[in-house]
């Protein structure tokens, strides 16, 4: 590429590493958007499981403990992994710099680091699904969450990281 050739969408690097190491606010916003969509569908799947359980009386589909886990994980995913970080992260990275006429955000490396921290916290919180779930409700109120034998500490640590 010569010195006079500007970088545009035709000669921009391609591949997964170009996405993971990008400093472009639009790409980072798209990564926030896609991860938000993923967590939205995961939280929606948990909501469907709860709705199917409540469709008829009795324990038809899942037990009481699994229902409590689904309720907690649905609320935590939708609040802490979708609404709070993904919507402002996606809209704030894609639309806001374009609306104010900025060529880029002020600190692009910090912007990418915030997405990595969000991803790490989300993976840490999702670890609790594999490791047995949490049954305290998405608010994690102290009287019940301190007496619960479920994975409250890893889940709250993942949310704190986010």
Where are these regions (language model features)?
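...captures the hydrophobic TM-helix bundle architecture rather than a specific catalytic motif
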Residues: 1-162
């Amino acid at each position: 590429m010569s010195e006079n050739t500007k970088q545009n969408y035709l000669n921009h690097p391609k591949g997964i590493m170009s996405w993971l190491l990008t400093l472009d606010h639009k790409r980072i916003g798209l990564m926030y958007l896609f991860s938000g969509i993923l967590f939205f569908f995961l939280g929606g799947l948990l909501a469907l499981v709860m709705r199917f359980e409540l469709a008829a009386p009795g324990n038809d589909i899942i037990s009481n403990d699994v229902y409590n886990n689904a309720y907690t994980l649905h609320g935590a995913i939708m609040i802490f992994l979708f609404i709070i970080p993904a919507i402002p992260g996606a809209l704030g990275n894609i639309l806001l710099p374009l609306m104010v006429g900025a060529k880029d955000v002020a600190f692009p490396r910090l912007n990418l680091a915030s997405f990595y921290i969000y991803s790490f916290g989300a993976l840490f919180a999702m670890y609790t699904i594999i490791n047995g779930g949490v049954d305290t409700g998405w608010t994690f109120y102290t009287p019940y969450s301190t007496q619960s034998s479920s994975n409250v500490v890893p889940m709250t640590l993942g949310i704190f990281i986010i």
